[in-house]
Amino acid sequence: MPPLLGDMAGLGKASGANENNPNEHWVGTWSNALHQPDLGVPGLANPGFNNQTLRQIVHISVGGRRVRVRLSTFGASGLVIGAAHIALHATGAAILTGSDRTLTFGGTPSITIPPGALVVSDPVELNVPELSDLAVSIFVPGNTGPAAWHFEGRQTSFISPSGRFYSKRRDAG
């Protein structure tokens, strides 16, 4: 089975400011359910992505001072994430100036997610109001193969032309 693009399985807030604080508590505030790349319905197959940036707008419920993102893959081979960013959403594909944050995974800005696994980003400082929208941008430097997707998504996602557009304030595609 070819690799499938992972999903943003959750964002959260921390009640404590110290990463080593045993009282720190993360709360999931957004997630989605994915479908197979091809449901057998003409026109609904997703061939995947190749050297592109994906920007997904997520409407969160709980706000906070710090956020982190979980990414997963359902594929039989690893999924390479070349870079990932999170920012406050402006309009369309635009992000609010000054809100862009680089996501890292164990201190590294890129990661290969093993088949069937999920990864959690390191926390980043970002003051997020409750009931706001965030833009999560993921650059995939190679061909992902068929990508999982959500059949009844209620937010517009953006796909760039070839290249790294993850921190652009303007439209990502």
Regions of interest found by a model, annotated:
Residues M1-G173:
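N-terminal secretory targeting modules
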